[in-house]
From Swiss-Prot:
Originating species: Yersinia pestis
EC number(s) given by UniProt: 3.6.1.23
Protein name: Deoxyuridine 5'-triphosphate nucleotidohydrolase
HAMAP family registered for this protein in UniProt: dUTPase_bact
Pfam families reported for this sequence: dUTPase (PF00692)
């Protein structure tokens, strides 16, 4: 298992609010919690930035982290990420903040310590472009945006 440096910025993390952990042996994501002093009510269409009380430094350019929505919040309540996916570069060292967006029809209250998103570590390949005049033909070619049909 890869070790990642984490800094607790809010003393409630690890005490009142659990540290991020994998829920099961097969879990890909670690839950991130809203490190709030009081509940926040999100009106329909509203976005806000929520602190997690944590900072990470991945420190390995072959890794990054992505912040993803929690499926239950999105499906049941319309609460998704304001930027859809958050990307944490390996050299970032600041607090993890989560942009949440209420795309639902009802106000939604986020409580202090509530699980609001999940973080997944992913491998990174930094590409070097090779300038060419043409590509070698492929079966797909330039077809895109539904060219292969729906069935």
């Amino acid at each position: 298992m890869k070790k990642i440096d984490i800094k607790i910025l809010d003393p409630r993390v690890g005490n009142e609010f659990p540290l991020p952990t994998y829920a099961t042996e097969g879990s890909a994501g670690l839950d991130l919690r809203a490190c709030l002093d009081h509940a926040v009510e999100l009106q329909p269409g509203q976005t806000t930035l929520l602190p997690t009380g944590l900072a990470i430094h991945i420190g390995d350019s072959a890794l990054a982290a992505v912040i993803l929505p929690r499926s239950g919040l999105g499906h049941k309540h319309g609460i998704v990420l304001g930027n859809l996916v958050g990307l944490i570069d390996s050299d970032y060292q600041g607090q993890l903040m989560v942009s949440v967006w209420n795309r639902g029809q009802q106000p939604f209250t986020i409580e202090p310590g509530e699980r609001i998103a999940q973080m997944v570590f992913v491998p990174v390949v930094q590409a070097e472009f090779n300038l060419v005049e043409d590509f070698t033909d492929s079966e797909r070619g330039t077809g895109g945006f539904g060219h292969s049909g729906r069935q």
